[in-house]
Regions:
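Gly/Ala-rich beta-loop-alpha elbow adjacent to hydrolase catalytic centers
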Residues: 94-98, 102, 371, 375, ...
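Conserved alpha/beta-hydrolase "acid-adjacent" motif
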Residues: 231-237, 459-465
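Catalytic active-site module of serine/aspartate enzymes centered on a nucleophile-bearing elbow/loop
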Residues: 248-279, 476-505
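Short beta-strand/loop motif that positions the catalytic acidic residue
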Residues: 218, 224-226, 446, 452-454
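Conserved alpha/beta-hydrolase catalytic His-Asp/Glu region
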Residues: 151-200, 204, 401-450, 456-457, ...
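Flexible "cap/lid" loop of the alpha/beta hydrolase fold
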Residues: 115-157, 380-385, 391-417
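Active-site loop/oxyanion-hole signature of alpha/beta-hydrolase fold enzymes
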Residues: 54-97, 262, 270, 293, ...
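Conserved HGGG/HGGXW glycine-rich cap/lid loop of the alpha/beta-hydrolase fold
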Residues: 6-67, 291-341
Length: 505
C-alpha cells in the first residue's frame, strides 16, 4: 500500500482502486480500517478511489500521541494526504462516523474542496443528534423481516443500557441480511481500533455552532446520501444536514440501510457517479432521480432530447452540441437507463411521466421536445395528455401505437453488465404487442406542430405505420431519412437539416 507522512510524522497508508481522477474515501467506524469499503460497489469504475486507513487503523501506524485520534485533529491527516497527492482541490467521500470528520474538514478548508459526498454520515459535528426514537422508528420499517423479533429485543436492551452487544442489532444496519452482510458485519470488530474509537468522540471535540456557521460558506457541491432504513442518520436527520450547505443534493437510496453500496451497488454507484461527473446533473422528478446533461445559453430557447430504449443521454451529445449554438439543450436519462434511478417498474406511461416531471422540475413548458424511439413514444403520450406543454414535437422512429403483427417474441437478456435495467425490455415489448387503443385514438388531440422522422426501408419500424401516425396528428408531417432506426446518430447532418426545415434555427 502507498504511504505518506502526517504533519506529526505518523506513517499513514492508503489503497488505490481504479483509474481516473482521485476520490479520497474516509472510512467510518469510527476508526475502522478502510477495507470494509471495498470498491464501494464498483465506484472504482468511474473514479480512482484513494481509500485512507485512519491513523492507528488498518496499515496505518499508531501515533505517539493518542489524543491525535480526536476527530477534530484528524482533519490534519486529510490535508496532509491532499498535499501528498499534489491536488489543489479534492473530491472527498466520507462514510458514517467520518461524516463528522469530513464536515470539520469542509469547515476548516473550504477552498480545498471540489466536491463532498457524505454517505449515511455521522452528524454529531453539526449538533444533529440521533435519538433512541430514531432507532425505534427505523427498526419498525423492518418488522416483516424474519430476524426482526430477536434483533428488536436486542435493540431494546441496548437502548436501555442492559446490553452492549452490537452484533445482535447488526441486521438493522443492512438492507439485506444475507451471507454477504453477515460476513461484512462479522469483520467489523477485527477492523476497528476499539481503543481509539472513544477518543474520536472525546468531550470537547465538536463545536456545532462554529462548524455550522463555517459550512454555510462552503461553495463546493455536496451530496448527502441516506439509506431508507438507516437509523444513524434517518433520512429526516440527513435532510437536516443537507440544509446546512448552500449547494447540496439529497438522495435517499430505497431499500438501503447503513451500507448502501452493499445493499444495491448499482443504485449507489449511479447516484454518486452522477454527482461526481461535472457534466451530469440530477433532479428529483416525481420521486425519481433523473440524471441529465445541459448545453448552451440558459436564456436561449429550450430543447429537450429524449433517448430511446436501452440508450441514455450520451447518445444525443453530438446533436446537442450542434443545437446548443442557438438553444439551451437538455438531454436526460429515463428511469432504468444510464445514471438515473432504476426502480424496477417500467411502462411507456411511466416514461411519459418522467418527461412530464422533468419539464416541470426545470420549468421548461413550451420547450421543443425531440424523442427517439421509446423517448418519442413518451413524448407523444405527453403531448396527448398535456396539450400546450410542448411547443414543438419531433418523433424520430417512434414505435407506432398500433398492434404489432406478428408480435415481438420474448427477448433474452444479453450476458454481462448493462447500461440499462433489463426489465425495461419485456415490460415495453408487452405494451408494443398490445398497445392501449387510447394511444392511437387520441392522436388527434395533439396541438403541437409535429415532425415524424422515419428511417426508411432499412428501419425495423414499419414506415407505413409512421406515415399513418403522422396523418392522425392535426399539424403533423412525415419525412424519411434513409438511415435505419438510428437516424440522429447515423445521419446527423440530414437529421439537423430536417430540424432546421421544421423551424429550429
Amino acid at each position: 500500500m502507498p504511504i505518506f507522512h502526517a504533519h506529526d510524522g505518523t506513517e499513514l497508508a492508503y489503497r488505490l482502486l481504479g483509474k481516473g481522477a482521485p476520490l479520497i474515501c474516509l472510512p467510518g467506524g469510527p476508526m475502522r480500517a478502510g477495507a470494509y469499503l471495498g470498491d464501494l460497489g464498483g465506484l472504482s469504475a468511474h473514479r480512482q478511489l484513494v481509500v485512507l486507513d485512519l491513523r492507528g487503523s488498518g496499515d496505518s501506524a499508531a501515533p505517539e500521541d493518542p489524543t491525535s485520534y480526536r476527530c477534530d485533529r484528524l482533519t490534519d491527516d486529510i490535508e496532509a494526504l491532499r498535499e501528498h497527492l499534489g491536488e489543489e482541490r479534492i473530491d472527498l467521500l466520507a462514510h458514517s462516523a467520518s461524516g463528522n470528520l469530513a464536515s470539520l474538514y469542509a469547515a476548516r478548508h473550504p477552498q480545498r474542496l471540489r466536491t463532498l459526498t457524505l454517505v449515511t454520515p455521522g452528524t454529531r459535528a453539526v449538533g444533529i443528534t440521533v435519538t433512541d426514537g430514531d432507532w425505534l422508528e427505523a427498526s419498525e420499517l423492518r418488522r416483516e423481516e424474519p430476524w426482526f423479533a430477536d434483533a428488536r429485543a436486542a435493540l431494546d436492551d441496548f437502548l436501555a443500557g442492559r446490553s452492549s452487544d452490537r452484533a445482535a442489532v447488526a441486521p438493522f444496519a443492512y438492507g439485506r441480511w444475507d451471507e454477504t452482510a453477515r460476513a461484512h458485519a462479522a469483520a467489523g470488530p477485527g477492523q476497528t481500533n476499539s481503543a481509539a474509537a472513544p477518543v474520536f468522540y472525546q468531550d470537547g471535540v465538536f463545536d456545532p455552532a462554529a462548524t455550522n456557521a463555517a459550512l454555510a460558506a462552503v461553495t463546493a457541491p455536496v451530496l448527502v446520501l441516506a439509506g431508507e432504513y438507516d437509523a444513524g442518520p434517518t433520512p429526516d436527520r440527513a435532510a437536516e444536514l443537507v440544509a446546512l450547505f448552500p449547494d447540496a443534493e439529497f438522495v435517499v437510496q430505497r431499500g438501503a440501510a447503513h451500507f448502501p453500496w452493499l445493499d444495491d451497488p448499482g443504485a449507489f454507484v449511479r447516484a454518486v457517479a452522477a454527482f461526481l461527473d461535472p457534466e451530469v446533473h440530477s433532479v428529483q422528478a416525481g420521486g425519481t432521480r433523473l440524471a441529465h446533461r445541459v448545453w448552451g445559453d440558459p436564456s436561449a430557447p429550450p430543447v429537450v432530447l429524449a433517448h430511446g430504449r436501452c440508450g441514455d443521454s450520451r447518445t444525443w451529445i453530438p446533436i446537442a452540441e450542434r443545437l446548443a449554438a442557438q438553444h439551451r439543450v437538455y438531454a436526460f436519462d429515463f428511469r432504468g437507463h444510464g445514471l438515473s434511478d432504476w426502480p424496477g417498474r417500467y411502462s411507456f406511461e411511466l416514461f411519459r411521466d418522467d418527461l412530464h416531471a422533468f419539464l416541470e422540475a426545470r420549468n421548461l413548458a413550451g420547450a421543443t421536445v425531440i424523442g427517439h424511439s421509446m423517448g418519442a413514444a413518451a413524448a407523444c403520450l405527453l403531448a396527448v395528455r398535456e396539450p400546450g406543454l410542448i411547443g414543438r414535437l419531433v418523433l424520430e422512429e417512434m414505435p407506432p401505437p398500433f398492434p404489432l403483427d406478428p408480435p415481438r417474441a420474448r427477448a433474452e437478456r444479453p450476458d454481462g453488465e448493462l447500461d440499462f435495467d433489463w426489465p425495461v425490455v419485456p415490460s415495453t415489448d408487452a405494451q408494443l404487442n398490445a398497445p392501449d387503443p387510447d394511444w392511437s385514438e387520441r392522436l388527434g388531440e395533439i396541438t403541437a406542430p409535429t415532425l415524424v422522422i422515419g428511417g426508411g426501408p432499412t428501419s425495423r419500424i414499419a414506415q407505413e405505420e409512421l406515415i399513418r401516425l403522422a396523418g392522425r396528428i392535426p399539424d403533423g408531417r412525415f419525412v424519411t431519412i434513409d438511415a435505419g432506426h438510428l437516424v440522429h446518430t447515423d445521419r446527423p447532418e440530414e437529421f439537423l437539416a430536417e430540424l432546421r426545415a421544421f423551424g429550429l434555427s
